[in-house]
């Protein structure tokens, strides 16, 4: 599905990149770091189901799903933070995660919030 036409002032996932500049655009102002943090824990039922999956090997789908949801939530929070800063793009976006306790994981998504103009 094609993304609807957006104004240059709108921040959309299409204007988020891991590169240090957004192709086809010129960075006119850096607004600081935008970030989104999510702390997730596994439920007892989920941990039990995942431990059963480890017996058979392969992808542990319960944990994969948990990680994907946490990354998406952190990404969405980063977008909201960047919008508060007045950004219409994010460059140098990264993810990081850390286990901060038994079964508790922090996922952070961060990048540089910027204002860009479209190249002629």
UniProtKB/Swiss-Prot annotation:
InterPro entries named in the record: UPF0145_dom_sf, UPF0145_YbjQ-like
Family matches, as Pfam families: YbjQ_1 (PF01906)
Family label: Belongs to the UPF0145 family.
Protein's name according to its UniProt entry: UPF0145 protein Bcenmc03_5217
Organism of provenance: Burkholderia orbicola (strain MC0-3)
């Amino acid at each position: 599905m094609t993304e609807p036409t957006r104004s240059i002032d709108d921040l959309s996932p299409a204007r988020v990149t891991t590169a240090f500049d957004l192709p086809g655009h010129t960075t006119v102002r850096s607004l600081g770091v935008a970030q989104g943090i999510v702390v997730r824990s596994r439920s007892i039922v989920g941990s039990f189901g995942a431990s059963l999956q480890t017996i058979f090997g392969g992808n542990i789908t319960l944990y994969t799903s948990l990680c994907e949801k946490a990354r998406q939530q952190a990404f969405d929070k980063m977008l909201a933070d960047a919008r508060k800063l007045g950004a219409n793009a994010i460059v140098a976006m990264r993810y990081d995660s850390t286990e901060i306790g038994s079964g508790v994981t922090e996922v952070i998504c961060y990048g540089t919030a910027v204002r860009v103009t479209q190249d002629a």
